[in-house]
Swiss-Prot record:
Sites where a glycan is attached: 5
Superkingdom, taxonomy of origin: Eukaryota
CDD domains membership: 7tmA_OR13-like
Cysteine disulfide partners in this protein: 97-189
Location of this chain's protein in the cell: Cell membrane
Organism: Homo sapiens
Side Cytoplasmic, residues: 47-54, 121-139, 218-237, 299-318
Extracellular side: 1-25, 76-99, 161-197, 259-277
TM regions (residue ranges): 26-46, 55-75, 100-120, 140-160, 198-217, 238-258, 278-298
Known function: Odorant receptor.
MF terms in GO: G protein-coupled receptor activity; olfactory receptor activity
Keyword entries, A-Z: Cell membrane, Disulfide bond, G-protein coupled receptor, Glycoprotein, Membrane, Olfaction, Receptor, Sensory transduction, Transducer, Transmembrane, Transmembrane helix
Protein name: Olfactory receptor 13C4
């Protein structure tokens, strides 16, 4: 390969919505409001899961980790996006881009595994209620959560290292809001077939396998619910699973759109960021973390009771 034109990039420029200047102020206001909701909503869920003894169960331990994950993910990306929207400062350092890519990929991978663990937890609770305390004891659910975080971190380390090691031939303009891995790989002037293969393997491990766990868990749950004679029992089982299932549909719907389409199609796409792609990216990165605590607090009686208890206790203390 001709190496004359290859130069090391010291920083990147994130185009974002620069092609739609009238939308930038609107997006700034929307993202800012949603970020505040994310911090408050997920923060309340974390505090409630720690302080309220009624939530000291595996499901709420997973939920607390999911809320913490959403805060970490959005905090690694939203503040810089807000700054670029309001100040027109669109440059990000090479190391800053790598850090942003790492956290985004790590949090996404971890969330896939966490959602799978939560589905398995619901399967054991509904299909094997008598053995639930034995199967899902504290050692088990803490270990499952630790594996989720560790595997997500390892996957992100591998993908980020492979993506950032290529020469970029002086081309440093990223057609995205963030240092998203596919957008960065478009700038590489080397053969990225290794990245495509590793991303495909990652998709199988972190998208397909957890989704299979979720699918079969809910098949067994549905079978058990339909066999239940008690209408109250069926309603309780459905209400317990509905929040998680809603989050799964929203999360996997957006992430499959972004990462499960053919890589050649994505990497050879148009130079300008499509409006639909930008909206889906924002939905995945901002709207989904905002909806998670809202969905769980609206659908789950225990969470609603815990939040009301915390708010009432705070009002009394004041």
């Amino acid at each position: 390969m001709d190496k004359i034109n290859q130069t090391f990039v010291r920083e990147f420029i994130l185009l974002g919505l620069s092609g739609y200047p009238k939308l930038e102020i609107i997006f700034f206001a929307l993202i800012l409001v949603m970020y505040v909701v994310i911090l408050i909503g997920n923060g309340v869920l974390i505090i409630a899961s720690i302080l309220d003894s009624r939530l000291h169960m595996p499901m709420y331990f997973f939920l607390g980790n999911l809320s913490f994950l959403d805060i970490c993910y959005t905090t690694s990306s939203i503040p810089s996006t807000l700054v670029s929207l309001i100040s027109k400062k669109r440059n990000i350092s090479f190391s800053g881009c790598a850090v942003q890519m790492f956290f985004g990929f790590a949090m996404g991978s971890t969330e896939c595994f966490l959602l799978g663990m939560m589905a398995f937890d619901r399967y054991v609770a509904i299909c094997n209620p008598l053995r639930y305390p034995i199967i899902m004891n504290k050692v088990v659910y803490v270990l499952l959560t630790s594996v989720s975080w560790l595997s997500g971190g390892i996957n992100s380390t591998v993908q980020t290292s492979l993506a950032m090691r290529w020469p970029f031939c002086g081309n440093n303009i990223i057609n995205h809001f963030l240092c998203e891995i596919l957008a960065v790989l478009k700038l590489a002037c080397s053969d990225i077939s290794v990245n495509i293969v590793t991303l495909a393997v990652s998709n199988i491990a972190f998208l397909v396998l957890p989704l299979l766990v979720i699918f079969f868990s809910y098949m067994f749950i549905l079978y058990t619910i339909l066999r239940t004679n008690s209408a109250t029992g069926r309603h309780k089982a459905f209400s317990t699973c509905s929040a998680h299932l809603t989050v799964v549909i929203i999360f996997y719907g957006t992430i499959f759109f972004m990462y499960a389409k053919p890589k050649s199609q994505d990497l050879l796409g148009k130079d300008n960021l499509q409006a639909t792609e930008g909206l889906v990216s924002m939905f995945y990165g901002v709207v989904t973390p905002m909806l998670n605590p809202i969905i769980y607090s609206l659908r789950n009686k225990d969470v609603k009771a815990a939040i009301k208890y915390l708010l009432s206790r705070k009002a009394i203390n004041q």
